[in-house]
């Protein structure tokens, strides 16, 4: 029962007052004529015979031949949602094919007296209530067909096919349409399935009957339809006949119901159809994970399930019949992979930059090695794991390597470099291209990064990650001005290889004074020139002053460039005023580098910010507590500890509400310290502060 609805839009009125409905075998299409006759011609067109085609600006004779139909200056628009147009007066389908309707869209009184309309059959139950309510609310509104077409994104067809108007269509159109629709798969779906009724894809013109509403298909596919060929009535009866009969029975029962109840029934059908069990797929998450991720593959893999288990959409993916299973550690977690430990522990991965000569051992290898050392060489194992705090012992393992030119420069001074750095060894390097200081270590143990143990080994000399570049400040900025790229490349060579570069600039204050003096001389010369009008001859400068003038750096620019180099060149700049100042500070630097390998603050970097030092006994711990809480002096803390040697003894008197006095009969502590101690011992809130 597909038909072509031909809408003729008047140019003057711009409304939907004149509408012509013509049955045809194609999809529902809208033909909006760019020009139309005026209202007088429209009235004469309604009185004309049923064989007349839609009116045009020029009145022509009409015949039944398809070629004589004038469709010039018309735009053919495909509108699959033509039911949204509220048309209140339509002609009966059984009277004639080309009958013309002369009624207004806003006339509801005449619509009540008409017989059953064509669009009433086309519109389904769920849409009829919307049309009725929308017609009451917007009875005075007018619809523009072009706006409706643009609203639904309908595109115009360049070559519209002519409308075939002949007598054979009257007898064959209905039977042909019914047979096509009954064979379509749309007749097997409920009327309230909107996704099938109005697909998101564009309308296909090859098979137009599949785009019709489901109500048309269900009405025309009934077994009582006499216009349907006999050969196609039994087609598909094995799979869908029962569903068709149930649906047609429900349609017959709903004919006498009002439209509001019809919509309620249609919505209930939609709810029933939507509550069907969805198609579920059992996911195996191990196929979605990377094979290299050995930690999560065994843990997150979906367990195998029986084929009789049906999961609905409300059940979780990881649901299992046995919810209370015994917690088991994954095999990959017990394997103790060194690389896995390196990646998961952040502080362990950073130890390589500070602790030289180390290796990653598994837990089993570590246990076997410790068991063997405790049997064979127990004293050596204890010795290499002992933490030393003496600076002399820390320097005993160090070797300081100077470049030849730098070592010769430091030996010119009055101090003995070897004596100041003893017991460290001072030696000269073979490369004199850069003023470089390297720190070497004599290692007799190897460090276990994974288990935090030192194992005795054969002596070996390794290089520390810290090195020093020593430059005179003026020479450095001369290279920075003339050979900046080469200087940057040399410094970045070390920092890219994981070295911590310390850039020492000597005589930086002397350079600042030379730059300031040069700027002051230039300023005085400009002032005297403006006052006297004659240029005064500059005083002869020394060779070093002339070299400073060639730098072209101001005092303010010098500070800015130092900050830029420190930030962008990945170095740490340290300035000294003379060579002797650096030589005197070098022993302390060597001691710090010597302690670095066994420093607990570096090995336990995660807790280094706490800055907590352990005490020898409980009495010393209580004494440090007094100092941290009330800044109590050491002598006064000793008096308190002599009477209360432990926390328990002090807590007993605090609970009693009285404290002992000292030997002179005075208070042991001030009132503020007593309040803080009382709060420390009795407070139950861990987030509370001691004021």
UniProtKB/Swiss-Prot annotation:
What does the record note about activity as a function of pH?
A: Optimum pH is 8.0 for cleavage of a 3'-flap structure.
Give the consequence of mutating residue 173 to R.
In allele MMS4-1; loss of activity
Mind listing the GO molecular function terms for this protein? DNA binding; endonuclease activity; metal ion binding
Q: Name one GO biological process term.
A: DNA topological change
Query: Do you know which InterPro entries this protein is assigned to?
Result: ERCC4_domain (IPR006166), Mms4/EME1/EME2 (IPR033310)
Q: Which residues carry this modification: N-acetylserine?
A: 2
Cofactor(s) the record lists: Mg(2+); Mn(2+)
Subunit text: Interacts with MUS81.
- Family statement drawn from the similarity comment of this UniProt entry: Belongs to the EME1/MMS4 family.
Fill in the misc note.
Two distinct classes of meiotic crossovers have been demonstrated in budding yeast. Class I crossovers exhibit crossover interference and require MSH4 and MSH5 for their resolution, while class II crossovers exhibit no crossover interference and require MUS81 and MMS4. While class I crossovers represent the majority of crossovers in S.cerevisiae, they are virtually absent in S.pombe which lacks orthologs of MSH4 and MSH5.
Q: What is this protein called?
A: Crossover junction endonuclease MMS4
Source species of the chain: Saccharomyces cerevisiae (strain ATCC 204508 / S288c) (Baker's yeast)
